[in-house]
Amino acid sequence: MESKMILKDGCQELGFHIDDNQVQQLLTYKDILLEWNEKMNLTAITEEEEVMVKHFLDSLSCIQSQYLKEEGTMIDVGTGAGFPGIPLKVYFPKLKLTLLDSLNKRVEFLKEVSQELGLEDVNFVHGRAEECGQEETHREQYDYAVARAVASLNVLVEYCLPFVKVGGYFICQKGPQLKEEIQNSQNAITVLGGKVVEQKEITLPFSDITHSLLVIEKIKQTPTKYPRKPGTPSKKPIK
């Protein structure tokens, strides 16, 4: 099946419509991703069909959350090659997007993608979540934080919840073992000012891959001691 139809049919299966211009933007993104991937390690997924499903449809599946709206400010924490932030920006062009990554080479790649796709209101930050989450320019400034499964949930919430303003949401993509992770992370979520408001299982179109979508609402401010200094959240997660 050609890539264009995977995107169109896949989005329809996930419950929303993607237009031809958005499809073209994502296909351009795929071309740049695979070209840059020959020079640096951006993704282990290089088969075109797999890029469509495991990167693009996977990222866009966040739209299934009832809490994600088409406008507002969003930070993608540890965005890597731009997932899920850039596909969400393509779908919701009014989102003001910040892409945070600790590797400068990846940030340069993200700048090129955004320029080639004609994306506006995209901000690029080279840094670590633990440090940026303590800076006034980023702390509790965003309606949404998003992240793919870059760490266990009790670590991830310390990276991400400090960025979210009270009344905003952390939208997190995790593997299928979500209930157990939530149980192990309940105290961390509460301490950091969050409350679980949505969880759902999603099977990606054209695959047997099932993952979980978790939404945590920020209901009170994060105590100033969080996030702790770089490396501490992963070495000593909040119990």
Curated annotation (Swiss-Prot):
Its main location: cytoplasm. S-adenosyl-L-methionine binds at G78, F83, A129, E130, R148. GO terms for cellular component: cytosol. InterPro entries: rRNA_ssu_MeTfrase_G (IPR003682), SAM-dependent_MTases_sf (IPR029063). The keyword Methyltransferase applies. Gene3D superfamilies: Vaccinia Virus protein VP39. Specifically methylates the N7 position of a guanine in 16S rRNA. Its EC number is 2.1.1.-. The gene is rsmG. Belongs to the methyltransferase superfamily. RNA methyltransferase RsmG family. SUPFAM superfamilies: S-adenosyl-L-methionine-dependent methyltransferases. It is found in: Cytoplasm. PANTHER family: S-ADENOSYL-L-METHIONINE-DEPENDENT METHYLTRANSFERASES SUPERFAMILY PROTEIN. Keywords: Cytoplasm, Methyltransferase, rRNA processing, S-adenosyl-L-methionine, Transferase. This is Ribosomal RNA small subunit methyltransferase G. One of its GO terms (molecular function) is rRNA (guanine-N7-)-methyltransferase activity.
